[in-house]
Amino acid sequence: MATTLATDVRLSIAHQTRFGFRLASTISSNPESTANNVAFSPVSLHVALSLITAGAGGATRDQLVATLGEGEAERLHALAEQVVQFVLADASYADSPRVTFANGVFVDASLPLKPSFQELAVCKYKAEAQSVDFQTKAAEVTAQVNSWVEKVTTGLIKDILPAGSISNTTRLVLGNALYFKGAWTDQFDSRVTKSDYFYLLDGSSIQTPFMYSSEEQYISSSDGLKVLKLPYKQGGDKRQFSMYILLPEAPSGIWSLAEKLSAEPELLERHIPRQKVALRQFKLPKFKISFGIEASDLLKHLGLQLPFSDEADLSEMVDSPMPQGLRISSVFHKTFVEVNETGTEAAAATIAKAVLLSASPPSDMDFIADHPFLFLIREDTSGVVLFIGHVVNPLRSL
C-alpha cells in the first residue's frame, strides 16, 4: 500500500470534496431528504463515475470530467488510483480502523469489454470484471450483485439493486462498495449515556440518548459554527481517520450551512480543530442512519445529463454491435452509518446501471449537539471525505 499521496493529487482531492458538498447541498434541497436523516459516500460515487469516464468518449466524457471537477480524464484516473490504493486500502493493523472497498464491472457475455477499458479498470481502480448473462438470467445476476455488495459491507448494505431493476435489456453494471469501522481514540462511557431533549426543525422536541464526556475535545468555534473532531484509533496505520460534527449555532441553520459548504468547500479546512480544549458541557446524540437513493436525478441537477441520454457515448467501454450504443439508466446508492460510545460503523455502495484557520476557542466553551447538524468522516492526511450526512432526528433508526 502506498503511504503518501502524490502532491499533484491533492488539488484533485479538493475538487472531489467540492463535488461531495455540491451533492450534499442538492440532497438537502429535496423536501423528502430534509425531513429525514441522510448519509452518503461522495468518494464512492466519485470513483464510480470516474470509472464510467474511462469508458466514455466525446462530449459525454467532457461532461463527466467537468462535473467531477477535473480538466482531463487522466487526472480522474490518477486520483482514483491514489484513493483506492492509499485511502481505501484494506489494512490489518491492530486497533486501526477497518476499511474495505471493492469495485465491480458486470458485463453481459455478448459484449466483451474493450481491452483498454478493462486494463484501466483493473490496474487503477482495482475492479473485478465479471461476464454475466443479463439476457436470460437477469434475476440471478441481480442476486449476484447484491450478494457481492452485502459481503463487502459485512451485511450492512442489502439489496443495493431493487427487484426488477435489472432486465434482459441491461448490458452493463458498474458499482462499488465501501465499509468502514473505527473505534474512537477516546471512547465514551456508556454508563453516563442518558436521554435528553433534541430540538427538531419544526420547533418541537424529542428525548433521545446522548453521550456525555468531561474530557477535553478538539473543538473550533467561529462565524456561528462549532466543529467537533473525533479521531479514530490509528494503531500502526499511517492514515488518520476522524469524524467531524458541524453544529450551526442557529437551531435551524443546517441548510444554510450546507449551501455555504457547497459554495465554499474550503470552509471546512478553515474550521478544522487543531487543539483540544476543556469544555463546560459536552453532549452528542447517538445515531444510526440507513439511507438509499437513486441518484441519477441528483447528478442531472449537477449538470450531468449526457450519460443518461440517448446521445450518451460509452463507446470506449465495450465492443458493441448495437448502433445506439449504451447509456446509464440509473445510479443506485445506499449508505449505513452508526455512531455510538465505542466508535462508528459505516458502509456505502454505488451501482451505475447502463441501457479553515481555526479560531482559538474560549475556555468556557461548551458543545451541545441538541439540534440538527451535519457530519462527515474524513481521512485527514489526504483530506478525502468518505461519508457526508445530516442528522435532523437522532431517534429515528435507533
UniProtKB/Swiss-Prot annotation:
Q: Where is this region: RCL?
A: 343-367
The record's listing under CDD domains reads: serpinP_plants
Cellular compartments per GO CC: extracellular space
Q: What superkingdom does the record give?
A: Eukaryota
Q: What's in the keyword line of the UniProt record?
A: Protease inhibitor, Serine protease inhibitor
Family as reported in the entry's similarity comment: Belongs to the serpin family.
According to the UniProt entry, the note on domains is: The reactive center loop (RCL) extends out from the body of the protein and directs binding to the target protease. The protease cleaves the serpin at the reactive site within the RCL, establishing a covalent linkage between the carboxyl group of the serpin reactive site and the serine hydroxyl of the protease. The resulting inactive serpin-protease complex is highly stable.
What is the protein's name according to its record? Serpin-Z2A
